[in-house]
């Protein structure tokens, strides 16, 4: 299976969800993912730093559908910035390959207060 590259945007304090539909590169039809396992992780620098794991679910194995998610609690704990991610699948024979990769941009939504809340400055008058 060829590696597909796509970029993602995640907003802190919100739930994140992305569904991918994988195709068999030889037949151009849905990739049957019966018996496959998978992981999807992101990190700030390639091959360095801590990893953040996405929740991964096969929503329809016969049609090649894989969903990655993060809860609002998980996104709240990710620093704003640029990350790299990859989705790895392992077939029933134990062969692991990267099927999707790309850049993740984590943003702080404008409509949410900064974390932690700011204390208002009150000047003292002598």
Per-region residue spans from a language model:
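Contiguous segments within soluble domain cores/interaction surfaces
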Residues: 1-126
């Amino acid at each position: 299976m060829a590696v597909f590259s796509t970029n993602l945007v995640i907003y802190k304090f919100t739930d994140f969800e992305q569904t991918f539909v994988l195709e068999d590169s030889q037949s151009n039809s849905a990739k049957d993912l019966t018996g496959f396992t998978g992981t999807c992780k992101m990190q700030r620098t390639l091959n360095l730093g801590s990893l953040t794991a996405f929740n991964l679910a096969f929503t329809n194995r016969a049609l090649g559908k894989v969903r990655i998610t993060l809860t609002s609690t998980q996104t709240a704990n990710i620093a704003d910035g640029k990350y790299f991610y990859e989705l790895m699948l392992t077939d029933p024979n134990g062969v692991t390959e990267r099927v999707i990769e790309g850049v993740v941009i984590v943003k702080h939504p404008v409509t949410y207060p900064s974390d932690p809340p700011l204390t208002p400055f009150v000047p003292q008058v002598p």
